[in-house]
Structures are given as structure tokens and as C-alpha cells.
């Protein structure tokens, strides 16, 4: 995701590999603390202690706490933008592509549950120009889902539907795995949750030939979700 250079986070350290490693370490600690005690009450000192680094080291990689929150949220969106296209690469059938896209979205949310919850709670805490960038990033991700839905309707595999609204129903469903994880975790595995979601949010809108196509889509998580390369 190319978020305007004017909004990039400056680092004193110039080694890209070291910057990536240290920022990952610091962001992981910050995500935990922001989720547990809130963005405003968390201090740089607390983040440093959680990450087992000095406050001085943090300031070599981030200018301030807003930088840390921004990169935390940006990382989630980057992962969506990387994983969804990767999961549907090489797939030609619209129904199969849509199912894989939903799976990919939910799998990323599952892997980054704390950060997903944090995005809902704390995007408003970013300065205004960065809030716009985060919203733009989410919109780009959502368009990938919407495009998959549109391909299904255009191909006659799904009846005419408000593609924009259905897209957001799917997005909200994926996010709910993190936001309401406490309510779902004792009832469903991730695989069961996504399977039920496909039955609720995709299958009812399919035409006869769309249902035939969906019946051929693998149901297991192992078959649907491709391991990172």
C-alpha cells in the first residue's frame, strides 16, 4: 500500500531489514498495550518495557506514539491487500474467487485479532490526515470483495444484488470474528465460522448454476487457505 510519502514514518536507522524487525517488535508490544489499556493511557515508556527495549531506541524508529498507532493499523490493511489477491491468484471461477476472498479476509482477521479490534477503537485517535489514509486503505480492500461479488452477478452465478451493501456485510462478518471473538470461540472454529458465513452471505444469493459451482468449492480450511509463500 502506498500511503503518501508526506505521511511516511521517519526512522533514524537506515538499514531496511533492521527497521522492519525493530518496528515489528515495537508494534507487537504496542498493540497488546493499546488493546488492554487504551491508546491514550499507554505511554512510550510502557511500550518500551513491554518490547524490552529502551525509550531511546523507540524514538530511533518512530517519531511519536501516533506513528506507532498509524503503522499498527496500516500493517493490518497491508496484510489484507497482500493476502486477498494471493489467495485468489490463478482462480478463474467467480464463485470460487469470492469464497477464497472471504476466507482470506477472515484468516487475516484471525491472525491479527487484537489489531483488528484496535482499528475499530483507535482509528479516531489518529490525526485527521492519517485517518483519511486508513479509511482509503480499507476502501481499497473492500473493493476487492465487491469486485468478486460483481463478477458473480455479471456471470449469472448470483442474482442481482446491492453489491456495495453485500460487500460490507461480508466485511462486518469478518471483523466480527475479532470484535465478538468471546461470543464465537466456544461455538465455532474459524473454519466453521467462515463456512456458516458463506452459507448466510453468499449461498442465498446464488443462482442455480452458482450453487452448482459453490458445491465444487473445497470446504476445508486446508484446501481454501494457501500457506504464505
From Swiss-Prot:
GO molecular function terms attached to this record: DNA-binding transcription factor activity; transcription cis-regulatory region binding
A Pfam family matched in the record: TetR_N
Record's signal peptide: none
InterPro entries in alphabetical order: DNA-bd_HTH_TetR-type_CS (IPR023772), Homeodomain-like_sf (IPR009057), HTH-type_TetR-like_transc_reg (IPR050109), HTH_TetR (IPR001647), KstR2_TetR_C (IPR041490), Tet_transcr_reg_TetR-rel_C_sf (IPR036271)
DNA-binding span(s): 43-62
Key words, A-Z: Activator, DNA-binding, Repressor, Transcription, Transcription regulation
Activity regulation info: Activity is regulated by the effector molecules 3-hydroxybenzoyl-CoA and benzoyl-CoA, which bind to HbdR, alleviating its repression on the three target promoters and inducing the expression of the hbd genes.
DNA-binding found in the keyword field: yes
Statement: the UniProt record of this protein carries the keyword Lyase: no
Subunit comment: Homodimer in solution.
Biological role: Transcriptional regulator that controls the expression of the hbd cluster, which contains three catabolic operons and is responsible for the anaerobic degradation of 3-hydroxybenzoate. HbdR suppresses the activity of the three catabolic promoters (PhbdN, PhbdE and PhbdH) by binding to a conserved palindromic operator box. In addition, it slightly increases activity of its own promoter (PhbdR). The HbdR-mediated repression of hbd genes may play a crucial biological role in maintaining requisite hydroxybenzoate levels in the cell.
Name the UniProt record assigns to this protein: HTH-type transcriptional regulator HbdR
Organism annotation: Aromatoleum sp. (strain CIB)
Amino acid at each position: 500500500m502506498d500511503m503518501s510519502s508526506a505521511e511516511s514514518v521517519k526512522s533514524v536507522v537506515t538499514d531496511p531489514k533492521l527497521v522492519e524487525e525493530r518496528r515489528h517488535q515495537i508494534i507487537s508490544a504496542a498493540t497488546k498495550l493499546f488493546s488492554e489499556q487504551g491508546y491514550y493511557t499507554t505511554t512510550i515508556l510502557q511500550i518500551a518495557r513491554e518490547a524490552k527495549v529502551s525509550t531511546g531506541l523507540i524514538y530511533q524508529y518512530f517519531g511519536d506514539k501516533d506513528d506507532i498507532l498509524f503503522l499498527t493499523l496500516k500493517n493490518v490493511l497491508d496484510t489484507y491487500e497482500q493476502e486477498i489477491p494471493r489467495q485468489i491468484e490463478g482462480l478463474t471461477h467467480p464463485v470460487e474467487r469470492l469464497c477464497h476472498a472471504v476466507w482470506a479476509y477472515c484468516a487475516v482477521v484471525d491472525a491479527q485479532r487484537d489489531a483488528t479490534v484496535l482499528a475499530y477503537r483507535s482509528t479516531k485517535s489518529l490525526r485527521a490526515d492519517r485517518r483519511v489514509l486508513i479509511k482509503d486503505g480499507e476502501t481499497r480492500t473492500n473493493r476487492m470483495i465487491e469486485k468478486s461479488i460483481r463478477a458473480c452477478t455479471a456471470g449469472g452465478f448470483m442474482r442481482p444484488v446491492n453489491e456495495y451493501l453485500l460487500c460490507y456485510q461480508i466485511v462486518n462478518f469478518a471483523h466480527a470474528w475479532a470484535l465478538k471473538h468471546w461470543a464465537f470461540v466456544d461455538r465455532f472454529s474459524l473454519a466453521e465460522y467462515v463456512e456458516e458465513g458463506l452459507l448466510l452471505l453468499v449461498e442465498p444469493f446464488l443462482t442455480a448454476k452458482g450453487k452448482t459451482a459453490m458445491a465444487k468449492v473445497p470446504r476445508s480450511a486446508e484446501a481454501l487457505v494457501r500457506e504464505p509463500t
